[in-house]
Amino acid sequence: MFDHISIQVASFAKTLSFYTAALARLGYVPQYVDDTAKSAGFGPEGDVRLWIAEGKPAAKVHLALRSPSREAVGAFHTAALRAGGKDNGKPGLRPDYHASYYAAFVFDPDGNNLEAVTHEAE
């Protein structure tokens, strides 16, 4: 089990705005923001799990974040698109993964594939 993950982003301000809007629907909120160092940490209250920092982005990554419900998956997708993300898979079942795998995918401003997923049966 990982403790946290950190990704480099091309524009801290743009990505901070995107992740703040998109991740709130999953219960991930900014826990730490340093405009001088151009870094921020997101997670559930009191627990930072995802860090972003301005720098030279590395290879594109796929981040799958657990969602509390199918409704939250849909809300994440809508919020991410409104915040400037690009659709990479509308909310829905992915039976090729397993019968109750419900997910949505968006590309963030740097082209990383961000996924919200729940494994709960409806």
Residues covered by each model-derived region:
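Vicinal oxygen chelate
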Residues: 11-13, 65-110
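Long, continuous compositionally biased terminal/linker segments
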Residues: 38-82
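Short glycine-/small-residue motifs
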Residues: 116
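N-terminal beta-strand motif that seeds the catalytic metal site of vicinal oxygen chelate
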Residues: 1-16, 63, 120-122
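Core segments of cupin and vicinal oxygen chelate
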Residues: 6-48
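Glycine-rich acetyl-CoA-binding "A-motif" of GNAT/NAT acetyltransferases
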Residues: 113
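Short glycine-enriched loop/turn motifs at secondary-structure junctions
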Residues: 1, 56-59, 98
